[in-house]
């Protein structure tokens, strides 16, 4: 993005320039890589090791690559996806429980300040928004932690009492008995996965319920007069959600992200709303730097810094 700021979104179709998993590496490079990673284990931060580690352990990339095993019949990728997806699910369930316990006597940051007369669509998996607004006012666009899917029948099954769920116990007592990869024929195997829609550009339909949810989300945006989008990057993998906003250009839309006024974010907004970067005017919104064009305001702020009630009133 620093070298080609104007063309970055067109040139970049993934988060990495190199796919290190598929490279043929020389012995010299392998030696340097090992030494670099060892340095990264020292107490002092090592930037190269951190970058390499982040790339090789990118959970989104791993989920995308391994989920495709269900479509190209690769048992090894399917097994890897089961492991990665349930590990991610277990981590999120444990962290969710930890956060809720830590804020048992106080409101959650950001979520605790969401006005209760709103309807909200979230692309996060955690239950924080539903805890604040209730299930009837919340749509989990990419699924959530409280359901899982049997892949051969597309049955969407609930996780009992997700807020108090012991993830290790659930995997041991529910997931393991429902997974069978012993047969060589994939059609004879049985897989259950968390109901988390992987970050593919072409979104898989894990269950018919998601068709209904995405239609309902579009209807909510259609009915709204003012839409506030918080902490969402509008990346290409979520083009199906971007298109919902694109199809309703007459709505007042506030977009709150720290990089809202940056060059690369403006280029992204041009793709979504069709408004050239030079059409935006600099303004202030509740004390924050912002840009405005037509009915769209780009507000440079973090989620916890904004007051949603004031934005709706302003």
Could you describe each region identified by the protein language model?
Residues 135-141:
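A short alpha->loop->secondary-structure connector
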Residues 107, 128-130, 236-242:
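Short, well-ordered alpha-helical microsegments
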Residues 165-222:
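Acidic, metal/cofactor-coordinating or nucleic-acid-engaging core segments within structured domains
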Residues 146-157, 263-268:
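Short, charged, surface-exposed secondary-structure boundary motifs
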Residues 1-129, 141, 146-148, 304-306:
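Gly/serine-rich nucleotide phosphate-binding loop at the start of the catalytic core
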Residues 93-102, 202-210, 232-234:
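Short, flexible loop segments at the rims of nucleotide/cofactor-binding pockets, characterized by
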Residues 1-16, 21, 210-314:
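SIR2/sirtuin-family catalytic core signature
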Residues 152-162, 306-314:
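Short, surface-exposed amphipathic charged segments that create phosphate/polyanion-binding patches used
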């Amino acid at each position: 993005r620093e070298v080609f700021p104007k063309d970055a979104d067109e040139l970049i179709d993934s988060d990495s320039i190199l796919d290190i998993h598929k490279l043929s590496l020389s012995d010299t490079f392998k030696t340097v890589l090992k030494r670099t990673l060892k340095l990264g284990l020292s107490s002092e931060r090592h930037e190269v090791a951190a970058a390499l580690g982040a790339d090789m352990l990118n959970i989104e990339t791993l989920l995308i690559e391994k989920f495709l095993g269900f479509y190209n019949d690769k048992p090894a990728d399917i097994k890897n996806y089961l492991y990665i997806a349930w590990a991610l699910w277990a981590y999120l369930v444990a962290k969710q429980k930890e956060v809720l316990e830590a804020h048992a006597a106080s409101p959650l940051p950001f979520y605790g300040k969401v006005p209760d007369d709103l309807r909200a669509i979230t692309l996060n998996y955690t239950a924080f928004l539903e805890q604040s607004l209730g299930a009837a006012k919340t749509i989990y666009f990419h699924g959530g932690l409280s359901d899982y899917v049997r892949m051969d029948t597309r049955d969407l099954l609930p996780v009992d009492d997700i807020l108090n769920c012991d993830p290790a116990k659930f995997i041991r007592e529910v997931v393991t008995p429902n997974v069978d990869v012993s047969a060589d024929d994939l059609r004879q195997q049985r897989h259950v996965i968390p109901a988390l829609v992987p970050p593919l550009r072409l979104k898989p339909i894990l269950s018919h319920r998601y068709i209904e949810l995405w239609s309902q989300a579009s209807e909510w945006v259609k009915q709204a007069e003012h839409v506030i989008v918080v902490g969402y990057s509008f990346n290409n993998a979520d083009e199906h959600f971007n298109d919902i906003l694109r199809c309703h250009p007459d709505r007042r839309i506030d977009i709150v992200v720290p990089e809202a006024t940056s060059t690369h974010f403006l280029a992204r907004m041009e793709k979504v709303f069709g408004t050239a970067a030079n059409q935006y005017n600099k303004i202030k919104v509740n004390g924050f730097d912002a840009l405005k064009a037509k009915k769209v305001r780009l507000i440079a702020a973090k989620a916890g810094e904004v007051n949603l009630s004031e934005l709706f009133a302003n």
